[in-house]
Amino acid sequence: MGRLEVLFLGLTCCLAAACAAKLGAVYTEGGFVEGVNKKLSLLGGDSVDIFKGIPFATAKTLENPQRHPGWQGTLKATNFKKRCLQATITQDNTYGQEDCLYLNIWVPQGRKQVSHNLPVMVWIYGGAFLMGSGQGANFLKNYLYDGEEIATRGNVIVVTFNYRVGPLGFLSTGDANLPGNFGLRDQHMAIAWVKRNIAAFGGDPDNITIFGESAGAASVSLQTLSPYNKGLIRRAISQSGMALSPWAIQKNPLFWAKTIAKKVGCPTEDTGKMAACLKITDPRALTLAYKLPVKKQEYPVVHYLAFIPVIDGDFIPDDPINLYNNTADIDYIAGINNMDGHLFATIDVPAVDKTKQTVTEEDFYRLVSGHTVAKGLKGAQATFDIYTESWAQDPSQENMKKTVVAFETDVLFLIPTEIALAQHKAHAKSAKTYSYLFSHPSRMPIYPKWMGADHADDLQYVFGKPFATPLGYRPQDRAVSKAMIAYWTNFARSGDPNMGNSPVPTHWYPYTLENGNYLDITKTITSASMKEHLREKFLKFWAVTFEVLPTVTGDQDTLTPPEDDSEVAPDPPSDDSQVVPVPPTDDSVEAQMPATIGF
């Protein structure tokens, strides 16, 4: 290389370095923080400022979080912090720590000046309220919830954070002694911190979108319904989960609190004494005192999700169905994956994924019965009949297995999402409502050929993995990812997924009560991807036919839990006798029927 070329290259690099904007140290309510500035090309230019591990709150065991007191000097925010204490996948050990309430920020930067007034997207992770972290799963330091691709492609600020999970996040006695919802309050504290501090990072505190998947999606829904977040949230996106999901609210927290108390040696007759004892118990012992059964359980696995949000009369003041007035001015996108129920079906009916094993009518009826306990034998039979109508014409194992997956998808995700969309639309003032179905098939080679999009399959596309790790993906995967990032970030910017900095493949029309408009997201998105009346027949069955069946009260119509086995997780209660009463209401605020959905 000649001397002139070397001089030119050196000058180019110097100019790039000089022109590249970066934040440096940022002053927050807790003190100064300094992250790292990552260049997006060798010659400089665009970059992203990354801050990892900023504390936003502190919390004692089984108590509400408090604002972080701050620090001296400049905090070097360059590494992710450990996740909140939780059980390992094998449920025989723990990892993480109690000191875990930290957040991470990605800020895209241009060439000449630091970003200003950018939309802010705050991510809430899923994991059954039992596991997870703000950075997500890690493979060779490639973290699932790395916000770089969303931030730089959509020109938005991305924030992720940790919140408490499992017993430490959601254990409740159902009264004031241990009200629960500690994990939800952690989430609220993170959102409130962003509201107070994000302007210093170049964000618009009046344009915050919260988004999440699964338990994170239900959390997003609950945060929009909680009066604590009034004025904090402008928009929301729920991917495969809502506050109305049957696994999102624990109606019998005392049952599970007593179960934990017995295992760790705390009293169970007096909730005050129980709470005092649990608060001084080794947090790891509390965490390991609960195990989610994933084999040979009597009921569908979601019935064993013990430590989840509760109606506490405060943060969640009432049944979520009664709180949709609180979302009247919050724009909303909600949707599901077309085979979201597959993950749960493989636990409840293991033969679904086994090519050499068959699913029987008895298998499916047992599954249906487990999900329709409240309506007794009539509910189980009516549900079984409508879902097996196609079996007479096509009794193949493929059809039967797809029926199992479709049923779990409907019960756990589609029906609650459709009802929530209708509630949001019916109560909207300025708010806009959008619906989608993610149908891009799973890339897992071990799955059957008929498999669609499993639970959580959408995450890799929303977080831009086909671009971050291109060797593992096809061009069609990058097309899906590009479209999702464009729709999501446009929505965060304007409240309309079609309007923003990023072009989209087709116009996404809003949801209506009459037509139930939704965007079908797959490898080719065209005008034909806008569809109506998703699974109308089954939605009508659940919202009308099933709903009007009498709720059983007699033992003859309920499933009887098997005898207790100390080696396995306890069986969920089968009736309402132990359910914690809903806070008293008057006639003006009694439980509402869902908004009418057009059929």
Swiss-Prot record:
EC code(s) of this entry: 3.1.1.13, 3.1.1.3, 3.1.1.6
- Please report which protein family the annotation says this sequence is part of: Belongs to the type-B carboxylesterase/lipase family.
| Protein name listed in UniProt | Bile salt-activated lipase
Ranges where the record places region Disordered: 553-599
GO BP: ceramide catabolic process; intestinal cholesterol absorption; pancreatic juice secretion
Chain ranges passing through the membrane: none
- List every stretch annotated 4 X 11 AA tandem repeats, O-glycosylated region: 559-588
Q: Where are the sequence repeats?
A: 559-569, 570-580, 581-588
The catalytic activity, as recorded, is: a triacylglycerol + H2O = a diacylglycerol + a fatty acid + H(+); 1,2,3-tri-(9Z-octadecenoyl)-glycerol + H2O = di-(9Z)-octadecenoylglycerol + (9Z)-octadecenoate + H(+); 1,2,3-trioctanoylglycerol + H2O = dioctanoylglycerol + octanoate + H(+); a sterol ester + H2O = a sterol + a fatty acid + H(+)
Spell out the molecular function terms from Gene Ontology: acetylesterase activity; sterol ester esterase activity; triacylglycerol lipase activity
Which PANTHER family does UniProt cross-reference here? NEUROLIGIN
- Assembly and binders: Interacts with CLC.
Work out whether the entry's keyword set contains Membrane.
no
Q: What is its main location?
A: secreted
Going by the UniProt record, its keywords in alphabetical order are: Disulfide bond, Glycoprotein, Hydrolase, Lipid degradation, Lipid metabolism, Repeat, Secreted, Serine esterase, Signal
Biological role stated in the UniProt entry:
Catalyzes the hydrolysis of a wide range of substrates including cholesteryl esters, phospholipids, lysophospholipids, di- and tri-acylglycerols, and fatty acid esters of hydroxy fatty acids (FAHFAs). Preferentially hydrolyzes FAHFAs with the ester bond further away from the carboxylate. Unsaturated FAHFAs are hydrolyzed more quickly than saturated FAHFAs. Has an essential role in the complete digestion of dietary lipids and their intestinal absorption, along with the absorption of fat-soluble vitamins.
At the top of the EC hierarchy, this enzyme's class is hydrolase
Q: Which cellular compartments is it found in?
A: Secreted
Q: Which InterPro entries match?
A: AB_hydrolase_fold, CarbesteraseB, Carboxylesterase_B_AS, Carboxylesterase_B_CS, Neuroligin/BSAL
For whether the record's keyword set contains Repeat, the answer is: yes
Q: Which PROSITE patterns match?
A: CARBOXYLESTERASE_B_1, CARBOXYLESTERASE_B_2
Q: How is its activity regulated?
A: Activated by bile salts such as sodium taurocholate.
* Glycan attachment residues as annotated in the record: N207, N325
Tissue distribution: EXpressed by eosinophils.
Q: Which organism is it from?
A: Mus musculus (Mouse)
